[in-house]
Amino acid sequence: MHCPFCAANDTKVIDSRLVAEGDQVRRRRECVACGERFTTFETAELVMPRLIKQDGSRQPFDEEKLRAGMQRALEKRPVSVERLEEAIARIKQQLRATGEREVKSLVLGELVMTELSKLDEVAYIRFASVYRRFQDLNEFREEIERLAREPSKSR
């Protein structure tokens, strides 16, 4: 790393510590040429995978679109912004954990449904009705019955 004081390219690391809940490394460095000390921060560059839509087109992951869709499902439901943000963070982490450059949008949809089922069952049904394109009352009934058979995740 170049010294910000004299532009020499020989520096040594004096101290390294994890910061920001382990997501960042803080390093104290010393320039071998001029002796000045400075601090650097390192973070991993975490790139979200692109989404492959059902029609085969590809688009970048859009966190705001994800948030808006989940907020729409959670509208007028007793779920805090903090819990919503935690769910979004888990979805993003799971997408990154695939290690893939591209994932099918269906994967994202299923992750959203899993998180919504943990947050609020009504929001889950709202989202599922649009996502799975429910056509009639029977499809709603079947999904509600399936949800009722599962152990409660939101209580």
UniProtKB/Swiss-Prot annotation:
Domain of life, source organism: Bacteria
Keywords in alphabetical order: ATP-binding, DNA-binding, Metal-binding, Nucleotide-binding, Repressor, Transcription, Transcription regulation, Zinc, Zinc-finger
Signal peptide range: none
Keyword flag rRNA-binding: no
GO biological process: negative regulation of DNA-templated transcription
Record text on cofactor binding: Binds 1 zinc ion.
Zinc finger (unnamed): 3-34
Cofactors (names): Zn(2+)
One Pfam entry name: Zn_ribbon_NrdR
GO molecular function, one term: ATP binding
Domain ATP-cone: residue ranges: 49-139
UniProt keyword Membrane present: no
Biological role: Negatively regulates transcription of bacterial ribonucleotide reductase nrd genes and operons by binding to NrdR-boxes.
Family the UniProt entry places it in: Belongs to the NrdR family.
Protein name as catalogued: Transcriptional repressor NrdR
Gene behind this protein: nrdR
